[in-house]
Structures are given as structure tokens and as C-alpha cells.
């Protein structure tokens, strides 16, 4: 397990706002910091050499244990078509690729695939897969029940697909807020810390795949004929 520590230095003057309010404020800030740290580790973590989990966007060399960035498995355009056959075809290739593990053994992945994209790209994906129903409602859905999720740790222009149950994320125990009033005495401040143990790694290099996003909203140039 890896130890994850978060801390905050609070000026003692803030205690005038009340000790209960300060503790609640510090706890909220540090827990949010935890969430950001875990999100980074589970997506982009560089492994034990970096004292981090192995992220979903990484490959692990089975012989040396070296952790490297995943190479792109293809391109996704989410281009419009009369009946959505382009999107269905592109995502079919994703589902097909994830249906085989690193040892070449087939596995069931339907209803288990999650697509993670940066919030900037999420708007483009949503726009390309949203339709208006006969009742006037706007509905967004992806083929094969792929679940879209936003994450700031995924680079812009990339889409991360992973299979539920193929990534081992472990968090041990709870956390406890500790207060140290002597550490920063000269600065007239109090140090607050929380710590927790966590780790994560994919079961194999086919637990997740990375694709390039090339979503364009520029209409194709018209071809003039004489």
C-alpha cells in the first residue's frame, strides 16, 4: 500500500470563526484534495518507481515491470451519419478490442465499458450523440451501453475506455484529522494533516485502451462541378 497524505496550514487568527467551523472547513478541503490525488493516481499514476499507483493510461512491461504511457489504439471521430452507423462502427471496434484480454482470451464486456474523457471533449462527444425525440426532449446515449464519465486527468484529445472489474483499486481504513499547534508556532499557524493508504493497478494491459479523439464541427467543403 502507498501512503497518501494531505495537509493544510491555517492561521490561528481563523480560529476566531469557531473551532468547529475550522475543523469542518479543513476536513472538507483535505478530503477533496484526497479525491484529486486518487483520481490522478488511478488514471496517470507511474507505478512504484514514482511511489504512485499504476494508472489506467499506463502499460506495464510483464518482464521488467517498467511503466509506460499507453499507445493509441485508434481514432474516434463520432462523425454524424443517417442512422448513426459511423459511431456504432467506431465503438464496435473499441468493444471488440476490449473483449480480449492480454493473453488473447475472450471475456464478456457488454454493459461493463466506461469511456473517460476530459470535460472539454465531453461536450463534443455529447453533441455528436444527442438527439431530439418526438416529444422535444434531448437525449444522449452511446451504443452498447458505454457509460461516459468526465475526468480532468485525461488529456484533451484522448478517450480512455476501461472494463469494470479489470482495475484493482484498494483503499485501506479510514482517515483521521490530526492537529499540530507547535510545528508552525513561529508562523502563528496550526498544521492539520490526514493520511490514508491506497494503491491501484490494472489486471493486465488490456484492462483499458486509449484512443485519439478527432471530433470536428467544420462542415465539409462543397464540391463544385462544372
Where are these regions (language model features)?
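Short glycine/proline-enriched loop/turn "hinge" motifs that connect secondary-structure elements
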Residues: 1-2, 184
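Alpha-helical scaffold segments that mediate packing/assembly in large oligomeric complexes
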Residues: 3-94, 219-225
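Active-site loop/lid in soluble adenylation, ligation, and acyl-transfer enzymes
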Residues: 9, 13, 182-184, 197-199
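Short helix/loop capping segments that flank catalytic or ligand/cofactor-binding pockets
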Residues: 17-19, 124-126, 171, 201-203
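General N-terminal targeting signals
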Residues: 25-27, 32, 43, 47, ...
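Intrinsically disordered or highly flexible coil/loop and linker segments, enriched in small
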Residues: 36-43, 47, 104-111, 201
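Extended oligomerization regions of viral-like shell subunits
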Residues: 55-185, 190, 196, 222-226
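Structural signal for terminal/edge beta-strands and the immediately following C-terminal loop/tail
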Residues: 201, 206-226
Amino acid at each position: 500500500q502507498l501512503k497518501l497524505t494531505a495537509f493544510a496550514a491555517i492561521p490561528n487568527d481563523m480560529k476566531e470563526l469557531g473551532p468547529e467551523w475550522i475543523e469542518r472547513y479543513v476536513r472538507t478541503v483535505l478530503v477533496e484534495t484526497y479525491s484529486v490525488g486518487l483520481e490522478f493516481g488511478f488514471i496517470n499514476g507511474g507505478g512504484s518507481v514514482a511511489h504512485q499507483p499504476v494508472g489506467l493510461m499506463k502499460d506495464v512491461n510483464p518482464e521488467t515491470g517498467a511503466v509506460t504511457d499507453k499507445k493509441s489504439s485508434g481514432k474516434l471521430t463520432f462523425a454524424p451519419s443517417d442512422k448513426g452507423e459511423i459511431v456504432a462502427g467506431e465503438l464496435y471496434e473499441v468493444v471488440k478490442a476490449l473483449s480480449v484480454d492480454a493473453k488473447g482470451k475472450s471475456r464478456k464486456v457488454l454493459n461493463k465499458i466506461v469511456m473517460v474523457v476530459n470535460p472539454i471533449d465531453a461536450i463534443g462527444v455529447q453533441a455528436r450523440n444527442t438527439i431530439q425525440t418526438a416529444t422535444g426532449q434531448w437525449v444522449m446515449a452511446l451504443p452498447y451501453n458505454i457509460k461516459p464519465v468526465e475526468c480532468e486527468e485525461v488529456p484533451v484529445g484522448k478517450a480512455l475506455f476501461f472494463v469494470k472489474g479489470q482495475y484493482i483499486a484498494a483503499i485501506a481504513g479510514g482517515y483521521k484529522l490530526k492537529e499540530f499547534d507547535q510545528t508552525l508556532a513561529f508562523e502563528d499557524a496550526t498544521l492539520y494533516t490526514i493520511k490514508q493508504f491506497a494503491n491501484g493497478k490494472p489486471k493486465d494491459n488490456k484492462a483499458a485502451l486509449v484512443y485519439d479523439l478527432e471530433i470536428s464541427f467544420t462542415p465539409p467543403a462543397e464540391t463544385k462541378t462544372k
